[in-house]
């Protein structure tokens, strides 16, 4: 709590006093030195030099020669004021001014001090009689005879004291330290040397003769009110003294004065004496850890002066000099010895280690209740609510405000009911005034009656001061009467308010008046001759007069013991209030030994970043002082905090031993929940407090060790790593015990910390991953919600499942975290008792365990079991960090019984963590756990993926491991050693937007030789583009390599924020790898820390672990399932004119996958690389990329659901194109139409059969000799036919191939203009076209159709040139040719671009010989079709040149896979420019982003049953790839289809987005009218269903065009929580609501389908099928397909017709499928179906539909397109409405109510509503209700 605020007058007087004081000091300095006020600077240097200015001797003083003097050894002879030569002479000291005023100008020489007159040995040590030298006095009343007594108390503890043998002087009446009776210890670690003239004492470590304490550096001064002694120290590394704000844990030795005298003074950046009186310090001597400590048992005011030598000078104004010296082999031992002397810390109550909330001045109990409520709601672990003085009536102890805090006892009971505690503040000052009601203040009256107050100097009159209640008296807690009174008052009040602990404040002791309300007497106690450098330089400032009297003595002597004595008295009170319970005492003022009785907080700090940092030093110092239960006010007490500061402070404060958030009156609340339930601060606080509560068993065990052995809890790094001098100065991080390293962020805006990592194995606490750092400073990335937590290898940590209170958490299962050391060992221990009973250790009522790991064995040994209640708890989980090999078996045993297998374990290879669960090891017994490790076969990564067969010789020559003893025949026999790590990380830079790391090839590690030459220097760049998207890229920073010229939609600068990112990225160093972790689960979702990483010029390889076996994507290739098979299958990717087949690389190139995570999340990964590659899937699970060029450029999308991850990917590559409405109609095509008449015959047959049919195609046979932009003589009537059908509402699409003939004998404008515009691909550095042969035939020859393809190529194919679509000029040329053909030859509505892999019928060029072997036959050839035939097989030569839009050139080797992509946009742009309409482009070859402009069909499939299910897989994959308008050739392209197959395929194809029946020449016709009437009727029926649903389908296509995502949707995208759906691929969804379950096997009328967990309706009947969450046999007729509508959705529909042109004029209808709650919703997107960019230009109608029980409404979201004839609502079908009889249905439309015609089928819960009698259009809102 803060002090009272000063009045304006007081502030004015203080300011004036300070000004006068400063002027006086300046004048004294100038007069004393007679030197200029401005220091002269040597003109040759800007740095002032330090030199002596005068030399003076006074009287008979013999000053040291200037030449030999060490100025840093000067001991100040005038410490009380600025020195003058006159005073110096008067004191007979040496006067030698210096131009640095920090250095004493007047200093002692050897003429001062004492001589030894006699020395004797005693039973405890020795005694020496000292006589004072005849020298002038400093402050009068010198004591001439002094007695030195030494006591060798233990082998490592020496006491020596200097007393007045003739007069009893005040000595500290310590309540634990007792007099030593002897005998003297033998075999001590120290020697004591006493020098006789002048007297000095040295303490020497025997083992190395190091002098630890040496008072010969200065004289002993011993007078009545001034005692001085100095000692030279052997080390510059000293720690301790208090209480002050020490900005650094290690003391600054540069002439620092630290006063010690308890004072109510808030913390600040100065040397003010604060609340406590701590006179212990410690020094570390050397890297062996040897250390010593010094304690002065003295409670009088003093100051400690530290100077650089180093020298410590004590200036004490009373008592005696009573020193204890402690020698230890380590710093920790020294602290233990000190605490053994003063009393080890109390064992805290377990609940007091929980988080506490407090505030000075909540103002009312209602506010406190709200604070408690909101933090409970935020699930903040929170044990204790604390009340400051505002709960009291008029600030009076033992009262509460019955107005503002009315109901306080009930509130406390509510806390208890929730397992929480209540702590109240008590100040020592007791009001002398009556209660607010006028009643007597009984606590005061009872105290008066028992004479318990501190008295004035007369010893009988209570001294009266002023504190919070006004005029007050002060209990004398040193008096037995007072202790009894205090205990009684606490007990009485506890009966009124059932508090659980006490916070004692203001006990320095503090008063708001100087001394008393009478002032203070003018005497040497109130005004001593020397006043240390205390605040205000006034002894009784803010406290009592120094001549006031207590039971232990004068206030002058015992002032600094007030808080100590109050803590002891409060402990007695607690014993009475809580018999046999520990309770909790928190004190502000402390003395040596206070930790036996109370905890401590660091006082009234300020909400600044500096004070948060300084709190660590304060905490560590109080650990030295024996008060381990310590912490600072989290978020700051004074001043307004900020969210960032408070968040960071909450992170740090979660690891204070005493963790309390507390602030002052007048400032905003700062409890965590105040910042908002979903704030980053709340999330971070909850997270780290949960970790604190998880670790409480470990923390509690540390407190047990502090209580039993004096060990530190919050531990300086140097205590554990003393052999490393870097640790001696580390104070921005600290340890819990020996094992948990805590690294907070202490700087505003920082997200990285320069952290020193000591020499040990360290594991990230949150992930369990081993860190590569050791004995080095690192830039640790600590984003906004993170603090550094690292577990030290070699230690075992007990944990417990957390809860929101310790009451609850103590009942939860226990566990262990084992952090293995380098030698795979670890040790630990665990203490457990009931958490609250007093003296359980002393009474043996506890459980104690030791843990030890070695050789994969964990021994859990109970060494003490006398707490039977604790045996109900059990160790349930054991997490072992650093398990380097896969664990194959875990066995367990109890009490030396035989081992049994335990199957419940998982091994995380990314983090090398073994997690063993469900153990049920009850406390009180011994257990053993063993785990077996092996390098699993499934972990092997092939080292010889080459085209030739691996042999042992080739394998070993490469540097890899050969092993033919494989269990799985697919496992590689040649594989990488686990230690393979060719690149080392030379530097890593973290920034708020990403990471940059440099890699260097390490020749000593590069023993494996892979294809091509390795690149020496690499750079890794990580960019946090979005909260859900991260890019990571590896490239050569010194030589520009090819990068994919495909633009992505990514932010120009990263937009992610640290607090909202879904991921964390880390560069691992040994081995190098990139790890990406999902924050929400901690799951590693990318982990390339696997062997085999290579970055060679033409061979790049990287592997990553996968988070599960569920991975989807990569293409284009024919897959047998949607989920990839991870059994060492390799799939090549390189665009090729290759009909689909197993493991055959086909038309497209999509290096994208989506992976599912076991925890129920999904993510996607794109490798932006267009070079040939292959990917191997391994059962690890893992995958390996092998790429033969470019760079590694990955993009990850974090989802977290499959659909969201897909949308995120599409946002980057571009949302799918919006097709025209007509393109959703049924389409017919055939390669092999002989003439126009055949097409006309087909068309007329379809029309006559009334089969829905929108689009007719022609393949290349319409062209003259397969030349683009020509029409063959056999098709001369085709333009007229196209005009005819277009006039009837149909559409026409033509095919265009890229290859342009160059052998024409007559002008061929397409080639001629192309050559003129230089559009064709050429050989590099020449103007020569690289000729190919494709479809175009030579002119003037007769085609022999009996020839094979290869024979025909030689006989009749023309030389053809490939347009270079990367060139700007090519797009212009292509547009002109398309426009010219449209205007001058034939109209069309869409374009089908084929053969654009690009495909050639020769290898590379017409000679089949290319010019660059290295490119066409690269050192590594991916696993592609025709693997040994070269990359140029059936395509262009790899060395041919393309020109990008920026004019730069690239090789076909790099951009081959982009050829189809490069053609797509120019074609789409040309189509729209030509037709002025949206149109559709269908492309065979695709690359990421192509879906923005084109659809895709799945290529030249086969008329086989197995090609049907593969078409579903292909559609779902292309949905992932961002190409939603997809489908397969219905009934198959190759081979003769057959009736049953074509029937089922037509039923399936009716629900392809792109529904086209297409086959090849010389096979039978397979169009619907080519079969029989039954087939015709089946086709008509199923296509009528399609056309009915087109508004719904069109709306879904709009949704993914606007937002990304899937139209053909895998079931798992909607039912991700149902893992059964993760394997389903024989069914699919249209959007979220329409499920298709086709028949994919011959001659069956039963299909086995999965019905996800939702309400489903049979589309054909409208009935609820009553099945969910199970596999079901679905029966159907030959002419039908299973279709189901999902409850909760509304599907807009339209009456079907033969074309979409006609259907769009029919009535709309709605299918309303209610969910279990009779709710549903849906939407309609509607435009004219053909205009370009209607969504982007707001030219559309958008309607939202909602069903709420018995009311259906529509809401208009956009009205940019209205055509009332297209949007007439005619029918509504409501399914699943319940079987309540409906009597009426009403329509509210245009504010008029209409009764409607309806039909209800009660049993089937169907309501059919007819609106055709009313002109209802959807451009106005509707409301339909029934009752």
UniProtKB/Swiss-Prot annotation:
Keywords recorded for this protein, A-Z: Cell membrane, Disulfide bond, Glycoprotein, Glycosidase, Hydrolase, Membrane, Multifunctional enzyme, Phosphoprotein, Repeat, Signal-anchor, Sulfation, Transmembrane, Transmembrane helix
Chain segments carrying region Disordered: 39-64
Modified residues (Phosphoserine): 7
Topology of this chain in the membrane: Single-pass type II membrane protein
Name of the featured protein: Sucrase-isomaltase, intestinal
InterPro entries per UniProt: Gal_mutarotase_sf_dom, Glyco_hydro_31_AS, Glyco_hydro_31_C, Glyco_hydro_31_CS, Glyco_hydro_31_N_dom, Glyco_hydro_31_TIM, Glyco_hydro_b, Glycoside_hydrolase_SF
Keyword Transport carried by entry: no
Organism annotation: Oryctolagus cuniculus
Active site: 505, 604, 1394, 1397, 1500
Locations listed in the record: Apical cell membrane
Membrane-side (Cytoplasmic) residue stretches: 2-12
Residues covered by the P-type domain: 61-110, 932-978
Residues modified to Sulfotyrosine: 391, 400, 1382, 1385
Record carries keyword Phosphoprotein: yes
One MF annotation (Gene Ontology) recorded for this entry: oligo-1,6-glucosidase activity
Region (Isomaltase): 110-1007
Note: There is a high degree of homology between the isomaltase and sucrase portions (41% of amino acid identity) indicating that this protein is evolved by partial gene duplication.
Domain of life per record: Eukaryota
Coiled coil: none
Single Gene Ontology BP annotation: carbohydrate metabolic process
Sequence ranges on the Lumenal membrane side: 33-1827
